[in-house]
Amino acid sequence: MIIIQQGDLVLTDRILTGDLLIDSDKIVAIDEHIPVPDGAKVIDAKGCYVFPGFIDPHTHFQMTNALASTADDFDSGTKAAILGGTTSIINFASPEEGSLCKGLEVHKERAAGRCSCDYKFHMELVEMNEEVSHEIPKVVEAGVSSFKVYLAYGFRLTDREIYDAIEAIKPTGALVGAHCENGDLIDALVADKRKCGDLDISNHPLTRPAMIESEAIKRFSTIGAALEYPVHIVHVSSKEGVDEVLRERALGHQVTCETCPQYLVLDESRYKLPDFEGVKYVMSPPLRTIRDQMALKDALVNGVFQTIGSDHCSFTFNDQKLKSRYDFTRIPGGIPGAEERGIIAYDVLVNQCNMSAVDFMKLVSENPAKLYGMYPKKGTLAVGSDGDITIVDKHIEHVLSKESAHTKADYIPYEGISVTGKVRDVILRGHHVVQDGSLTESYLGECIP
């Protein structure tokens, strides 16, 4: 048994300063005062927020694309995640040899026994045909509750294929998310840059302007609306993107959305850093302007967004990104961030924007659990829910650095950023796996059905 005493318990509708008792893997009692059972481990949480374990709905651990393989596999990635207070991740699984079922099986095998937090999978749809349509309900039966399509990259689907995909998914009730950038326009802008020889890093954001994001959001939302089915937009990065989501909702279209910490605290000036440092920040969508940052923060405070994902997709600076510094189109896109996601979002939203701890909790715990079929097993402090707990000391100020991070990448994009609030303790299904900021038990993660 574990009893957490006199913490500020972040419940779904209020803050309760009190105690929480975990027996085996479940929460069994929540009250202002709970007698300490014989033999129970006592955790003093005075001055700390006690959150339901954070859920990261957007990770790319152990991924290989056309340019490189990620620095972080399930082992290192989930260790970094849980040290950042994340007790559950949803990783992206891709098909194998054209098969969704085989792809899911392969990704489950890669993760089994190597994860230090709980996990489940989104299934990527990179082509649409009769076999894929036939396998969609099978992978849903096997635990997949969400699919992702791409409107960019070489494996993007056409509008008709996206329509067919949503039509096939609709009977299952699974969520359909999308990477929303106009791939054809990106290809055209990149081709123009290549003709002119403008391939330095500063051109990356110029080939993926915000209007390309908003156009794709409109198109994807329209396809969903044509089928009267809800859709989800991942990693919204711009004011234009937010505005388009609001326009779609005003039309009665069912659209949920996610943003990421990098778009709240980093901006496009990073692409002009000396000594090719800008390659560290190549990601898609790219970093935007301060104006976009402010719009995203306002949207978060005003309830436009449902979730905050890390989009952790790590590559090393020296060995993987830097070698393509003279051609931004060859730089592997993505950054580490699973460990820093929760505390950056906390500092920005709760400390800087005066968001309530309850509303913050919904973004990082409750809403992703509901969207992805894990609630109330995950995402809430309630009797009967899993004993997944993240304790944040509100008062500790610290500076984020690679030296204290646990990604296998050789940098973090948040180097030097000062935050107030630190993940102190983490409990995963009743196991006290992070104590005073140190990982004490590994590989206890289970696949979430």
Q: What is the predicted function of each stretch?
A:
Residues 134-308, 324:
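Histidine/acidic residue-rich metal-binding segments in metalloenzymes
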Residues 7, 322-327, 383-448:
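C-terminal cap of metal-dependent C-N hydrolases
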Residues 7, 20, 25, 47, ...:
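Divalent metal-coordination and catalytic microenvironments
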Residues 198-228, 302, 306-308, 314-394:
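His/Asp/Glu-enriched, well-ordered alpha-helical/loop segment
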Residues 110-125:
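A glycine-rich helix N-cap at a beta->alpha junction
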Residues 45-114, 131:
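Metal-associated gating/positioning segment near the N- to mid-region
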Residues 205, 280-283, 326-332, 409-413:
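Short beta-alpha connecting loops at secondary-structure transitions
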Residues 1-3, 8-52:
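Histidine-rich, glycine-flanked metal-binding segment
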